[in-house]
A protein has these predicted regions:
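Acidic/polar active-site rim loop that often engages polyanionic ligands
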Residues: 1, 41-48
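A charged helix-plus-loop insertion that forms the helical arch/lid used to bind
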Residues: 1-7, 51-53
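Alpha-helix N-cap/helix-initiation motif
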Residues: 5-8, 12, 106, 175-176
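Glycine-rich, aromatic-flanked loop segments that form ligand/cofactor-binding clefts
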Residues: 12-39, 59-83
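Generic detector of intrinsically disordered, low-complexity, polar/charged segments
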Residues: 13, 17, 45, 50, ...
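Detector for Asparagine
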Residues: 29-31, 39-44, 181, 188
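Second-shell residues forming the walls of enzyme active-site clefts
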Residues: 54-210
Length: 210
């Protein structure tokens, strides 16, 4: 949000390029950023200043600079958290949020920055552990939904890059579905890279199950 407050997308590009160069010098080749969530819910406990703003146009404009800058700095990047974490009042690290709005509203607000990021050449997209009943009414979060990952993101939106999950140890998955079951469901949904960020033993169990 601070970068968007400069009013200068070129500053965002330069910040991304410098960040990319510094990460690459340390041996890091993939930065799991930027967030292209639209911070449209004042009660949102987790996105806040991670977002570039409260309108799709603002988010898309400044995310484009960061996406270009990070890649010019020599690292991969991604857009997150698909289809959007901006309009939640719950934190998916702690529980399972739901964005219950019609498809046309999702198109105007949540999906617009992702469509822009795809057009801008973002190489990867991270999925959200959030329910979107208008996109999939089966009761599984986006990360575990074939309708959302393969049907919407790959099919309708034409994304051909890498699809990653958010961490499968977050409570939105672990508490309601189990991390190992979540990993299998995410892979079946079409997720390419499944993240288990904390527990070595759990990572091993998931790898064996897969």
């Amino acid at each position: 949000m601070a970068l968007a407050a400069t009013g200068d997308p070129e500053t965002t590009y330069l910040a991304g390029k410098l960040t990319g160069e510094e990460l690459r010098s340390l041996g890091v080749n993939f930065n799991l950023a930027p967030s292209v969530d639209v911070n449209c819910n004042p009660a949102n406990p987790i996105i806040g200043v991670r977002s570039y703003g409260d309108t799709p146009a603002t988010v898309a404009k400044y995310a484009a600079g960061m996406i270009r800058g990070l890649q010019d700095g020599g690292v991969l990047c991604l857009a997150k958290h698909f289809p959007g974490h901006g309009d939640t009042s719950l934190d998916s690290h702690l529980t399972l949020p739901c964005v219950d709005k019609p498809r046309d509203e999702l198109e105007r607000m949540e999906l617009a920055p992702f469509r822009a990021a795809i057009a801008d050449g973002v190489p990867a997209i991270m999925t959200a552990h959030i329910l979107f009943p208008a996109l999939d009414d089966s009761g599984v979060p986006a990360t575990m939904s074939r309708r959302i990952v393969t049907g919407l993101l790959r099919g309708e939106m034409g994304f051909t890059g890498l699809v990653t999950s958010d961490c499968m140890e977050m409570q939105a998955v672990q508490k309601f579905f189990g991390s190992v079951n979540g990993v299998l469901a995410a892979m079946n949904a079409g997720v390419d890279l499944v993240l288990l960020s904390h527990t070595t033993l759990l990572s091993g169990e998931a790898a064996k199950a897969a």
